[in-house]
């Protein structure tokens, strides 16, 4: 695990974005941990979040021309990632996002920001069922752009309805790489170094045995 990944886990724990316990997911599964990126909700949180996203992007080595943040959660993520890339990596790249509702005055259409063209890096918080990605792909393709990759904060590395994860489905269906700041594997590695969190480690490992990919 790289230093920025460890720092991201500690940041998420400090903001209670990442919690351990027993949680019922939308799928009905009982999970020993929960991740709610909506709790990154202050200026400082966003500034830090952008740095972690930018670090993961640069680390991935994937080449892209533009950041796209799907409405609504992807909008602040794309914005802060663009700022962090410019400030900390000297990469001044365009970004844009979509509106859920098209506008009939002012800037036309359902896109805000830079023109959606070239190789697009889609940034979002998590992929649960992959629905937001599929909707975004329609927008990207309609504008003649291509998907370079997808960046999210956490890859839960668990099966969807079938034998593979929603992330693996996205990679298969769109022939692109999905990268994440951290994965379930990183989370387990972090817990292994924290003896005081042994009960959480056991629960997370048991969950991975049952639902992991």
From Swiss-Prot:
Annotated pathway: Pyrimidine metabolism; UMP biosynthesis via de novo pathway; UMP from orotate: step 1/2
Descriptive protein name: Orotate phosphoribosyltransferase
Binding site for orotate: 34-35, 128, 156
Protein's organism: Shigella dysenteriae serotype 1 (strain Sd197)
Keywords: Glycosyltransferase, Magnesium, Pyrimidine biosynthesis, Transferase
GO biological process: 'de novo' pyrimidine nucleobase biosynthetic process; 'de novo' UMP biosynthetic process; pyrimidine ribonucleoside biosynthetic process
Function in brief: Catalyzes the transfer of a ribosyl phosphate group from 5-phosphoribose 1-diphosphate to orotate, leading to the formation of orotidine monophosphate (OMP).
Signal peptide: none
Annotated 5-phospho-alpha-D-ribose 1-diphosphate binding sites: 26, 72-73, 99-100, 103, 105, 124-132
Pfam families (alphabetical): Pribosyltran (PF00156)
């Amino acid at each position: 695990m790289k230093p920025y990944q460890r720092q991201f886990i500690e940041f998420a724990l400090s903001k209670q974005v990442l919690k351990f316990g027993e949680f019922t997911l939308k799928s009905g599964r009982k999970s020993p941990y929960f991740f709610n990126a909506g709790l990154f909700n202050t200026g400082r949180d966003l500034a830090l979040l952008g740095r972690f996203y930018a670090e993961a992007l640069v680390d991935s080595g994937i080449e892209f021309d533009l950041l796209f943040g799907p409405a609504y959660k992807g909008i602040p993520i794309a914005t802060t990632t663009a700022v962090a890339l410019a400030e900390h990596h000297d990469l001044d790249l365009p970004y844009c996002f979509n509106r859920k509702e098209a506008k009939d005055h002012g800037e036309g259409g359902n896109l805000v920001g830079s023109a959606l063209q070239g190789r697009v890096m889609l940034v979002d918080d998590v992929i649960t069922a992959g629905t937001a990605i599929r909707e975004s792909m329609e927008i990207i393709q309609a504008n003649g752009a291509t998907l370079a990759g997808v960046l999210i904060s956490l890859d839960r590395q668990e099966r969807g309805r079938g034998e593979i994860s929603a992330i693996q489905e996205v990679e298969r269906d769109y022939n692109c790489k999905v990268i994440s700041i951290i994965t379930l594997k990183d989370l387990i590695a972090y817990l292994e170094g924290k003896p005081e969190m042994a009960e959480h480690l056991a629960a997370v490992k048991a969950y991975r045995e049952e639902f992991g990919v």
